From Swiss-Prot:
Glycosylated residues in this chain: 117, 354
Annotated active site: 36 (nucleophile), 326, 329
Name by which UniProt lists this protein: GDSL esterase/lipase LTL1
Tissue: Mostly expressed in flowers, reproductive stems and rosette leaves, and, to a lower extent, in roots.
Major location (coarse): secreted
Annotated signal sequence range: 1-27
Length: 366
């Protein structure tokens, strides 16, 4: 068994991170952009249906209360913060994001958004990626008033940035309804090329705004989500159209990142192969301690994949035995498997290096 896939391997990796990586990396701010996979609660402050503010969301969070995270507990940004010895970043819209809390960083992510501005229009009031960038500029002005412009520029340049986009551009746009506007406008391969082109503009904007170490996650195994199984699967097989979309999108994202890094002249952007990370435990759930990788812990209908996770939904008693928390989102345990690969994974998962290597390189420059 591959040690990185086993419980022992996970513990060894965690020991390495806590005892070796965290002490060597100077405290740095952490900024998060993207969708529901990384939203720490911004949508709780918006009038939108894309919210996770009801029980049983947060059932395993330290406070045992919903926080706006689409998880039973911690999400990917929380676990990255934990691994590098920093507190979780607050949502940018939180009234508590003031004073010294600003220096930790901020989470700008908003459930439902995508690369394109017409993605997630059914959710109406969400923070589209262009607005997230505006908030990042606003954040820098707020911090400049606190510590001065030079120190602010240094804080941003030395920060870690995470961006997670793309899934909703397929699930909540191209494949949202039969004969959607985008599917009539583009054949799938052409749509992917368009998405990658638009994503390139976003990454270059991040660099322009001062980001110098950016982790970019590709789309996960979208067709294997319980919501997709409930709609499209007869025997538990993943929905082929979305799997094909991911197979087209992710390699082109890696190529884009290599191209942008070449333009800049340094490896600012690091690609995470979220699809492969997902497929490892979805294809072999028992190897990771899951009893199922198809049925969501919280939900209703086939695979618990219909509708929202609510107080009256089916709820599994042990979330650690399930890969999916709700119809679309991983459990905290699955998120920990993903972050473990982000931090210590081989070139199969991370390009051009894993996050631990990147951060150790960064620490030598600070």
């Amino acid at each position: 068994m591959n040690i990185n896939c086993s419980p022992l391997g996970f513990l060894i990796s965690l020991f390495f991170i806590v005892t070796f990586l965290a002490p060597q990396v100077k405290s740095r701010a952490f900024f998060v952009f993207g969708d529901s996979l990384v939203d720490n609660g911004n949508n709780d402050y918006l009038v939108t249906t894309a919210r996770a503010d009801n029980y049983p969301y947060g059932i395993d969070y330290p406070t045992r209360r919903p926080t706006g995270r689409f998880s039973n507990g911690l999400n990917i940004p929380d676990i990255i913060s934990e691994a590098i010895g920093m507190p979780s970043t607050l949502p940018y819209l939180s009234p508590h994001l003031t004073g010294e809390n600003l220096l930790v960083g901020a989470n700008f992510a908003s459930a439902g958004i995508g690369i394109l501005n017409d993605t997630g229009i059914q959710f109406v009031n969400i923070i589209r990626i262009s607005k997230q960038m505006e908030y990042f500029e606003q954040y820098q002005l707020r911090v400049s008033a606190l510590i001065g412009p030079e120190a602010t520029q240094q804080l941003v340049n030395q920060a870690l940035v995470l961006i997670t986009l793309g899934g909703n551009d397929f699930v909540n746009n191209y494949y949202l309804i039969p004969f959607s506007a985008r599917s009539r406008q583009y054949a799938l391969p052409d749509y992917v090329v368009y998405l990658i082109s638009e994503y390139g503009k976003i990454l270059r904007k991040l660099y322009e705004l001062g980001a110098r170490r950016v982790l970019v996650t590709g789309t996960g195994a979208m067709g294997c989500a319980p919501a997709e199984l409930a709609q499209h699967s007869r025997n538990g097989e993943c929905y082929g159209a979305l799997q094909t979309a991911a197979a087209l999108f992710n390699p082109q994202l890696v190529d884009l990142i290599a191209s942008v890094n070449a333009e800049i002249g340094q490896d600012v952007f690091v690609a995470a192969n979220a699809y492969q990370m997902n497929m490892d435990y979805l294809s072999n759930p028992e190897q990771f301690g899951f009893v199922t990788s198809k049925v969501a812990c919280c939900g209703q209908g086939p695979y618990n994949g219909i509708g929202l996770c609510t107080p009256v939904s089916n709820l599994c008693p042990n979330r650690d035995l399930y890969a999916f928390w709700d119809a679309f989102h991983p459990t905290e345990k699955a998120n920990r498997i993903i972050v473990n690969q982000i931090l210590t994974g081989s070139s199969k998962y991370m390009h051009p290096m894993n996050l631990s290597t990147a951060m150790l390189l960064d620490s030598s420059k600070i």
